C-alpha cells in the first residue's frame, strides 16, 4: 500500500525480491493531475500495472467490500509506505503475519505526515527509515529495525527523501 513516488522505490524492491510475491497493490484512486487537470493514475498504480500486478484503489480502505477483497487475497503480510489512509483494526488483523509500515524518520520522532520536512525544520542531526509492525495507533507499533543517516548541511527534503528511500529499500 502506497501512493507517492517514494513508495515506488519500495514497491520496486519488493517486486524484484526473489522470495516475495506481490499479490496485489493498493493505492489511492485516480485523481485530477497536471495543468489540464486530467484524471490520471498515480505513480504507484502506473508502476504496478507496468509489472502486471493487480491494483486496487478503494476510496475508503476500511469499507467492508474492500476488506472482503483483501480476505480473498489472504496476504501473509501487508507492506505500507506513505499510503495516506488510516488502517482500521479489522484490516490490520487480516494478514497472517501482520502489517509492516516503512516510515521515513527514526520513530517515535516525527510520527505522521511530512517527517523529512520536520527533521530538517527542527534541526535534527540524523534521520532514517523505520520498519515497524502496525497497530491501531499512528506510527506506534513495535519497531523491527532502523536505518540511520546523518542530515548534512546541504541536504534538502528532496535529496534526503531519495537517499532514505533507497537505503530503506535495500
Residue ranges and their predicted role:
Residues 17, 21-26, 50-80, 85-104:
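Internal alpha/beta domain cores that form substrate/cofactor-binding pockets in large enzymes
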